[in-house]
């Protein structure tokens, strides 16, 4: 009853009224065969941007989304994350999985401090040789390329840290760097937090 139906028309010589009907529910999607599990540590932006981030991260196959309370996160945005938004976020995940056909069951964890986020990553992950952690940074000093960081062939888990609208503070970058997160910078672009 709730199944989305899509009508596709076959474009070939023959009967013009031949068609295929397709419908997918998130529960019907087969588990991911990907050998890499992705985590997104997102510093808390405005609520509307967080919804867009959750949708796009789910469509891309992110396994865990961890909202991080950072120095540049505005207090009202943090409060919005901790309030009744959880049900809305779960609905967004379900809809994004249906739309994209993503086989990854995305989980949104509770908002945590930066120290808690680092501890979570270190506790939940494997040996250093089997994981990689990057932080997208708008400054280009002492950064590496994505290829340099992710070129190891035995990586099983990847953490991606993204700042809020104000970015990530220098002290937070230092804390992340000291704990194995490698700052990366795209030479030609500074991306918005929701991109």
Protein language model features and the residues they cover:
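N-terminal positively charged helical leader segments and presequences
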Residues: 1-29
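RNA substrate-binding interface of SAM-dependent RNA methyltransferases
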Residues: 30-132
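Short acidic/polar active-site loop segments enriched in Thr and Asp
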Residues: 63-64, 156, 182
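Short amphipathic alpha-helical segments
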Residues: 79, 147-148, 172-175
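A mid-sequence, solvent-exposed acidic-amphipathic segment
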Residues: 112-161
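Short Gly/Pro-enriched loop/turn and capping motifs at secondary-structure junctions
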Residues: 139-143, 165-169, 190-191
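A C-terminal functional module that forms or caps the active site or interfaces directly
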Residues: 155-175
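Structured adenosyl-cofactor binding patch, chiefly the S-adenosyl-L-methionine
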Residues: 169-195
């Amino acid at each position: 009853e709730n199944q989305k139906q899509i009508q596709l028309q076959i474009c070939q010589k023959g009967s013009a009224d031949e068609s295929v009907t397709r419908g997918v529910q998130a529960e019907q999607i087969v588990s991911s065969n990907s050998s890499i599990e992705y985590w997104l540590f997102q510093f808390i932006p405005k609520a509307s941007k967080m919804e867009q981030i959750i949708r796009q991260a789910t469509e891309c196959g992110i396994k865990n989304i961890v909202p991080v309370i950072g120095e540049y996160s505005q207090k009202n945005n943090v409060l919005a994350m901790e309030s009744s938004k959880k049900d809305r976020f779960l609905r967004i995940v379900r809809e994004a999985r249906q739309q994209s056909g993503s086989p990854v069951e995305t989980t949104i964890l509770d908002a945590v401090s930066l120290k808690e986020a680092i501890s979570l990553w270190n506790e939940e992950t494997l040996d250093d040789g089997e994981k990689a952690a990057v932080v997208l940074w708008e400054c280009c000093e002492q950064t590496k390329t994505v290829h340099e960081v992710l070129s190891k062939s035995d990586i099983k888990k990847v953490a991606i840290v993204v700042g809020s609208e104000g970015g990530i503070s220098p002290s937070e970058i230092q804390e992340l760097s000291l704990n194995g997160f490698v700052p990366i910078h795209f030479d030609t672009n500074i991306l918005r937090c929701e991109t």
